[in-house]
């Protein structure tokens, strides 16, 4: 069939898209007790690794632009999880730092990866994650 390559099940993008949507659904009840959305959880993960990052650095880590991040960070600041401040050395840069509440949330969040593994019983999950990370790096070079 000449249009076989246009079938949905032949596309790389669709299983990635579907898996991403479904994985966010699995995370939702795990994050609910923390009051976090999946996107907010990703921001917290980056800040727990290293606090005091710029919006640009956060965007680079999460593959998001500042137009997407800024409203998300404003909501998180309003919730008391982080603070946004201008870099004293460069007023154009906005720095993001965790509040005490944001820091303390990490203790509760430590349970989430194990809870996820119990819900998503995938063999060779590390191999799958590494393959996806390889794909992200390949795609990032092409953008």
Protein language model regions, located:
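C-terminal regulatory/oligomerization modules of transcriptional regulators
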Residues: 1-5, 111, 126-143
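N-terminal leader segment of winged-helix/HTH proteins
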Residues: 1-34, 139
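Charged, amphipathic alpha-helical coiled-coil/dimerization segments
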Residues: 24, 74-133
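Short helix-coil-helix linker/hinge
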Residues: 34-39, 68, 99, 125
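Short alpha-helical "packing" element that flanks the helix-turn-helix/winged-helix DNA-binding module
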Residues: 43-44
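Short capping segments at the starts of secondary-structure elements
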Residues: 50-54
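Residues within helix-turn-helix
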Residues: 55-56, 67, 74, 94
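The alpha-helix within a helix-turn-helix
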Residues: 59
């Amino acid at each position: 069939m000449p249009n076989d390559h246009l079938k949905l099940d032949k596309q790389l993008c669709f299983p990635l898209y579907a898996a991403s949507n479904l994985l966010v659904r699995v995370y939702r009840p795990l994050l609910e007790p923390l009051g976090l959305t999946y996107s907010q959880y990703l921001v917290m993960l980056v800040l727990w690794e290293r606090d005091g990052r710029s919006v640009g650095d956060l965007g680079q880590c999460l593959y998001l632009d500042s137009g997407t991040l800024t409203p998300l960070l404003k909501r998180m600041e309003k919730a008391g999880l982080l603070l946004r401040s201008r870099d004293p050395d460069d007023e154009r840069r906005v720095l993001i730092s965790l509040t005490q509440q944001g820091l303390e949330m990490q203790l509760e969040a430590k349970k989430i990866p194990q809870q996820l593994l119990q819900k998503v019983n995938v063999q060779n999950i590390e191999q799958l994650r590494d393959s996806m990370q390889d794909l992200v790096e390949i795609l990032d070079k092409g953008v």
